[in-house]
């Protein structure tokens, strides 16, 4: 793939030249990811799942135009996850757009064992309680002991599984049937695991 890809950004060039060899380095340097090929190169085993397919209409000068609206989640099931939305009159293009956006939105997720009931020290849950919000949806993710599983809605479970989380409790509020907002709220909560330090990192 590197032979065909002509990078347009500094980060892309560093990846092609082999000066950056891992996705961890990208986030350690706080460099923005603007090319999907960077993700394809550094996270080749990425999995994607279509979370929702809807139909939306918008008004144009020539009348109403109907489009597919798709939400996709991507992850390597080992600490990286992204969520994206795409719209198009063709379902295949909408899925492709959503997948590209999800890849560009990919973030690292800090895993741990934050439950006082467990304390096994393995990265099966999250290190501390986090919350995320999108639209009217708010979700709280709470560390759970080993064996509890993912106590969450199906949409939240998919995003958590793609991030590599195996055990978590959750509480959600608002219009939780809105798939995109639910997925985005979980994504926003998981982002916070990386933004804040847990006591063992002080």
From Swiss-Prot:
Stored Gene3D superfamilies: 3.30.160.20, 3.30.230.10
Q: Per UniProt, what is one GO molecular function of this protein?
A: rRNA binding
Q: Does the keyword Ribonucleoprotein apply?
A: yes
Task: Look up keyword Ribonucleoprotein and say if it applies.
Answer: yes
Q: Could you give one GO CC term from the UniProt record?
A: cytosolic small ribosomal subunit
> Which GO terms of type biological process are on file?
translation
Return the domain comment text from this UniProt entry.
The N-terminal domain interacts with the head of the 30S subunit; the C-terminal domain interacts with the body and contacts protein S4. The interaction surface between S4 and S5 is involved in control of translational fidelity.
Protein name per the record: Small ribosomal subunit protein uS5
Organism in which the protein naturally occurs: Thermofilum pendens (strain DSM 2475 / Hrk 5)
Q: Which gene encodes it?
A: rps5
């Amino acid at each position: 793939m590197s032979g065909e890809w002509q990078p347009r950004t500094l980060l892309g060039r560093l990846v092609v030249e082999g000066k950056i060899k891992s996705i961890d380095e990208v986030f350690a340097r706080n460099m923005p990811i603007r090319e999907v090929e960077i993700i394809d190169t550094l996270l080749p085993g990425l999995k994607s799942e279509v979370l929702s397919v809807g139909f939306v209409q918008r008004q144009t000068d020539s009348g109403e135009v109907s489009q597919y609206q798709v939400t996709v989640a991507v992850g390597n099931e080992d600490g990286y996850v992204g969520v994206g939305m795409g719209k198009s009159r063709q379902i295949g293009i909408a899925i492709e757009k959503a997948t590209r956006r999800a890849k560009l939105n990919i973030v690292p997720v800090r895993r741990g064992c934050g439950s006082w009931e467990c304390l096994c020290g393995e990265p099966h849950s999250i290190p501390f309680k986090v919350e995320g919000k999108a639209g009217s949806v708010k979700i709280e993710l709470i560390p759970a002991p080993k064996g509890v599983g993912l106590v969450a809605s199906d949409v939240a479970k998919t995003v958590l599984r793609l991030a590599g989380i195996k055990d978590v409790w959750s509480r959600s509020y608002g219009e939780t049937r809105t798939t995109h907002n639910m997925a985005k709220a979980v994504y926003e909560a998981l982002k916070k695991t990386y933004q804040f330090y847990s006591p063992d990192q002080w």
